[in-house]
Every structure is written in C-alpha cells, then in structure tokens.
Amino acid sequence: YQTQKLPLFFGYTNTNDNGKIGPVFTHYLRLTSEVDSEGFPNSDHLYEFENIFKTFCYRKKITYNRILRSAINFTTHQPDDTKTYIHCDHDFPHKQFLMYLNNFDGGSTFFYDNNEKVIYKSTPMKYNVIMSDGELHSQGYCAPQQYRVALVVTYV
C-alpha cells in the first residue's frame, strides 16, 4: 500500500475509562449501512483492499455472506494512553478481520470477555491476520516515532 495515495480522514475513538480521546486517521472503504446489510462503497481503493480479505477467506476456506464495513485505520503513539476504549464494532452478531499493514512496536489488539477481562492479546506483525467473532476489543498505541496501520473488515 502507498499511504501517499490513500487519503486519511481525522477522527477520534470514543472515550476510554479516563475520558481521554484517542485520535485516529481513517480511510473508509465501505460505510456501515442498515443493521446486518452490506455497507456502502466509499472509496476507489475498496476493491484493492477488500480483495485482500476475500483472497484470505478463499485460501482459508472461510465463508461469508456480505461485508458490513471496511476501513484502513492509522494511529500514532499517544503518550497519555496505553490503549483505546473497549468496544464492539456493531451491536448485532458479526465477525471481524484485522490485518496489520506495517511493522511497529507495541500497538497490540486486545480481546475481552463480557466482564472486560483480557482473553487474547495479539502480537502485531506486518500482514498478520486476526479473525474474531465480534468480541469486545481495544487497541494499544505504537511506540514513539512509529505508526500503526491496520485493515479492518466486519462481515457476516
């Protein structure tokens, strides 16, 4: 991927336990539609990145019906926070695909049970993929002078 050709839009994650807001730059490939419906295409880069997901699913024999949302998330080091707020991407059953698109230190993805106890912590590495059943999750921030880029696809 070439970030110089991929427009990123500034936004915030929701607040975490301390009420602080974590900045994030996002390229929205597919926007969320109605509950459980395929999302709306939003980017000229949609097919390029969603084909990564589709190829992975084909090779691993993973079936899916439709893509709900897809995005490229770009975050940097945040000295006042260690991770983003704990959240679930949708309020209905779904699955999640996350692929790290670069190497960096820190910035793990954490998955939680319903009591917000960590049940899994990823080790980020370029092109590593995490598939989940839509569990609660959060992300850590990368080390100073680094950035974290991830492709996220939610689907059913």
List each model region and its residues:
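Short catalytic/ligand-binding loop motif for oxyanion handling, primarily in non-cytosolic enzymes
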Residues: D17-K20, Q78-T84, S138-Y141
